[in-house]
Amino acid sequence: MNALHFGAGNIGRGFIGKLLADSGVFVTFADINQTQIDQINQNKQYGVKIVGDASRVEVVKNIAAINSKDEEAVIEQVKSVELITTAVGPNVLGFIAPLFAKALAARLEAGNTQPLNIIACENMVRGTSFFKAKIFENLTDSQQAEIEKFVGFVDSAVDRIVPPAELNEADPLEVTVEEFSEWIVDKTQFKGQIPDIKGMELTDNLMAFVERKLFTLNTGHLISAYLGKQAGVKWIKEAIAIDSVKAAVKATMEESGAVLIKRYNFDPQAHAAYIEKILKRFANPYLNDDVNRVGREPIRKLSPNDRLIKPLLGTLEYGLPHKNLVNGVVMALQYRNEEDPQAVELAQFIADNGVAAAVEKYTGLTNQEVIDQVVALYN
């Protein structure tokens, strides 16, 4: 089986690309980093350093790479592969959608109507459905109808902490990852036979898993980063070692967890164990996870479908406590990082228009009581 994977960054190499290659899939990475592309094509392998109680390096083989700016090369791949995955970041999906539209149209014209499945492995809710909508903006109604027949747009939930690691001179492509990984896909959205990939779990209730991960791992990670930054530490593991930070992170995840328990009928004890597992992952002494990396892009993280506002809206829907989630929103608004364009834009908007206007613009919150709480805490 041949797959095209967009994004040869840490997640691409250390998580999705590795699972595919481990399952005997030949993986072609598409990226804009020509140095990395050359290294993949020259070395034809790279190491994945899995860190935890028993660290080890596993070698990934059966790989090649192309430059995603080379439209012809991308189109040729899309015309023939059986699976396409992405790990490019939510913001990039919209940029690559026109090329995907052109490539899928070319596959159609070439007469290849074999099933093709596309899975966006991004930190967003129903990322593949979003990607599909962006692709379809660039196609005619008749092209869309034909593509719908043989292309499956499969939503997924992904979870693995893959922070940047020090360069290994002997293997510049080596990537460091935690032991834990979770890749859950919506089995109802595939076209043709579902590929047999070790580590890819199938479900017909994806939203429960998407929101479990978003409301717990992503929410907790972000709160750890903001509190860690306020405490003056560099790494998530240092932040979570501070008792008051750990308590606040846990309390926030319990608030968002109450929404999940109500919405999806999760077992409270099982979810409490899931929270403890995540706290342990944050404390992994072998992972250097920078608080600025985790805290970056506050505008995206304040959006209505992301890790702060979505669970907060859930607490309002079910009449549940949300004090810690409101604190999270305040910390996102207070996040300052001169090297992060979104942080700069947010700070400027608040300076020009005030906190209440920023809450309205970026979060979509309409509950006046909550908006007033955010403004009061911010000031």
Curated annotation (Swiss-Prot):
Its EC number is 1.1.1.17. GO terms for molecular function: mannitol-1-phosphate 5-dehydrogenase activity. Keywords: NAD, Oxidoreductase. It catalyses: D-mannitol 1-phosphate + NAD(+) = beta-D-fructose 6-phosphate + NADH + H(+). Pfam families: Mannitol_dh, Mannitol_dh_C. InterPro entries: 6-PGluconate_DH-like_C_sf, 6PGD_dom2, Mannitol_1_phos_5_DH, Mannitol_DH, Mannitol_DH_C, Mannitol_DH_CS, Mannitol_DH_N, NAD(P)-bd_dom_sf. The keyword Lipoprotein does not apply. PROSITE patterns: MANNITOL_DHGENASE. NAD(+) binds at A3, L4, H5, F6, G7, A8, G9, N10, I11, G12, R13, G14. Transmembrane segments: none annotated. Belongs to the mannitol dehydrogenase family. This is Mannitol-1-phosphate 5-dehydrogenase. The gene is mtlD.
